[in-house]
């Protein structure tokens, strides 16, 4: 699981954080080192492996959290608002990294986000939830994640279906919010 706040062990180095799961499984040291080194290469943090995580930027900490999750080799990765606190450029780079890892590993990734644009870019399926009670309001099948694996995400946003789909979902959410707040105007 990858959280909005990295949930890293502050007293450990980057390498120790990524290797924590394999250590708990009593993995042989050579195997653990190979996995940790590979994942640090994948997330671009090899040169920071001996740094304490509190010395890293937010984006770097999220990459450590992602590598730590992958070191456990889960079948399913749950990401709960993992990019929400990042600046726009770092967020876009992390979105590209998530797509790359999704394609390379074949892992199922469940991403929880409040960003419609992020959901469109990273999801093959997008589920819009309705509140009170929480339930599925609408589900979409999307082509954008597959396109984003091999293209700059800024180009994917220019796809002719992207903007209209984004507006449709935002309008749907806006309407649900107005219903909840009791501010929706009835069409006469």
Model-derived features: where do they sit?
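Short helical segment in ABC ATPase nucleotide-binding domains corresponding to the A-loop/adjacent helical element
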Residues: 3, 15-23, 33, 37, ...
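Catalytic "switch" loops of ABC-type ATPases
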Residues: 4-9, 115
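Conserved ABC ATPase "signature" region
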Residues: 19, 30-48, 100
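Hydrophobic anchor residue at the start of the ABC signature
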Residues: 66
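Catalytic Walker B motif of ABC-type/P-loop ATPase nucleotide-binding domains
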Residues: 77-80
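Conserved H-loop
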Residues: 106-112
